[in-house]
Every structure is written in C-alpha cells, then in structure tokens.
Amino acid sequence: MSHPRWFGAALLAALAAVASLAIVAASGAAGPPLPKSSNGNPVEVVGTGVPTPTAFAFTGSTVFAGSGPNEETNGPGGLFTVADRKATKVPNTPPIVFGLAWQSDKLYVSTGPSIVALEGWDGTAFSKETVIFASTNKKFAGFNGIAFGPEGRLYAGLSLNPKYDHSQNPYKPSQAVVSMTAAGKGMRVVAEGMRQPFQLNFPKGSKYPYVTVLGQDKGGKAPNDEIVVAKPGQNYGFPTCTWILPKQEKACKGFDEPAIFLPPHSSPMGIGSIGNTLYVSLFSGTGKGPEVVEMSTKGQPRPLLTGFAAPVIALGVNQGSIYVGDLTGSIYKVAAK
C-alpha cells in the first residue's frame, strides 16, 4: 500500500493476508456470493468496482463511496458514485479517500494528510474544491474517518503511524480524535489515548461521537478492539493501558474505560446508527469470518450480515438501510428492519 502510515498497520497486515482470497472471490463471472442477513431482508448489490471501499456519504438519491489505494494494482482509489450495480468515478476528485461527510450541500473528504470540501454537485461532478485543512509536517499521521457533530463541528480520527504501534507518538496531535470548524479552523483534541480511531458516528441524541478503535495485532496477548464515546478531555490509556484485565488493572487506573469491548482481531471499521442501534462492520469478524453486527449503544453485538466473500470495511446508513463495502469491491445494501 502506498500510504501505510495513514491507513494503519493493523489493517495493512490483515489486507496482505486476505488479498488473494478477495481476488479469487471476485473472479467468478457472476461475482462473489451475496452475504446473508439475519433479519430475512434481501441483500442487493448496489455497485461493483470500488477498490478498498472505506466510507459512504449520501445526498438525495446519490450514494458516494470512498476508496483507499487499490490493493491489487497499488493504483489510486478515489471517490465514486454507486448505482445500478456499477461504480462511476467522480472526475477531478482526490485519488485516495479515508472518510466522507455530507454537510450543508458540501461533501467533506478526508484524504489522509488533508481534508477538502467539494461543492457544486450537479449529479455527475463537483464544480469547486477547497482545502480546509492540510498538514505539511511529515510527522503528522493523517486523518481517518470524519463526521459532523450536532453543534456543527467536524470530528476526525487520527491515523496510526506504525512506528508507534506499541508506544506513545510524541507528535501532537496523534492517537486521538480531534474536531475543527466546518472551515477547518480551531482544531483541538477531543479525546486521546487511542491506538487508531478509525470511523465515527453520532447516534440520535448523542453530543459525542462513537468511534471504532483498532487494537494491536502483534506483540504478546492481543487486546480487545474497542468502541469509545469520545468525550472532551477523556484519555483511554493507550499505550500504557490496553484494557487487558485483570492483568492491567493497576496500569489502567485513572484512564477512561471504552464504552464497548469487541474480541481481539475483530477489527471494527465502519460505524453507523439508526436511533440507539449501532451498526458496525467487522473486518475479521468475531470468529466466523467478516460480518456486520448490530448492537445497542451499550454493546452486546449480534450478527446482521454474514457470509461475505472478503473482509468488510466501509459501512453507512441511509433511509433505514445499511450499506457496506468489502474487498471484492462490491457495495451491498439491506434494510435494517
């Protein structure tokens, strides 16, 4: 991958292990088999051909899908619209996308080292691109997912520099969730002590983002993956505390406990919500392969979609349906209820 420090060492390692499986799964003439829903609702293919899907955004009937670097060709991904079982590249847009958020008739895009705002959408292309935040400091690990809070500030998870996979990154800000104005001003740290906060979502009525956090993959006993509710001033302990209890009970004293623990290596990626129900894509799953789970804001995940041909990354919610993208490049949709 061309930008490993922006996308995360944990995901890189997993992608390398499963890339060949994704190729095989996608190579059939009929495409990969459809995942199965636990609620009995049909799963449909919205589009195909989105390499390494990372995020979704929606406006009207338009579905935007962001894409990271192409894992098979090492070429760029970018921004696509998906409809009628195909993906269409949006011209003159960033070649790599890690997060998307639609707000006030603008599409905000996390490209890694920068966040840009696209406006003037005519159904095919945007007429204007504005860089609202960009870092030229090579020590800045970059941005992952983004989401707008109810007060209008833009929140972002910061990417992992793999050099600090088990240690504190001395560069500030890092290993944190940050927020800024819609114009990219006044960036400040919201919460810290997270190895790699990936995607964010504000459930109905929540002032704070629910954030998927990827735990360590190597070096001793693997800690649980996490979902945190990033409240101002909180510190979730990384790297001093990775919540391996009771072993780390003393080390974790004084830190803020994550809201939800998930099994090690389950790798929570995308996150969305309908009311107080969370929907989370698990890259590796809880033991039976990649899956999408649903749970209350207090946890207790249960399967919603299983049987994917390849690991899942992107997840979004729109008009009562769950959208998910896997490494075959396929985008699926299923009604939540």
Model-found features: residue ranges?
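Bacterial N-terminal signal peptides
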Residues: L11-I23
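Short loop/turn segments immediately following the C-termini of beta-strands
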Residues: G68-N70, G112-S114, G120, S159-N161, ...
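Beta-propeller domain segments
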Residues: G31-S37, F143, L160-R188, M194-R302, ...
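Beta-propeller domains
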Residues: F64-D84
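Bacterial N-terminal signal peptides that target proteins for export
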Residues: M1-A13
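Asp-box/WD-like beta-propeller blade repeats and closely related beta-sheet repeat scaffolds
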Residues: P113-F148
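Beta-rich, blade/repeat-based domains predominating
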Residues: G49-T62, T93-K106, S110, N137-L154, ...
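A short beta-strand motif characteristic of beta-propeller blades
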Residues: P42-T48, K86-N92, T130-T136, G186-V190, ...
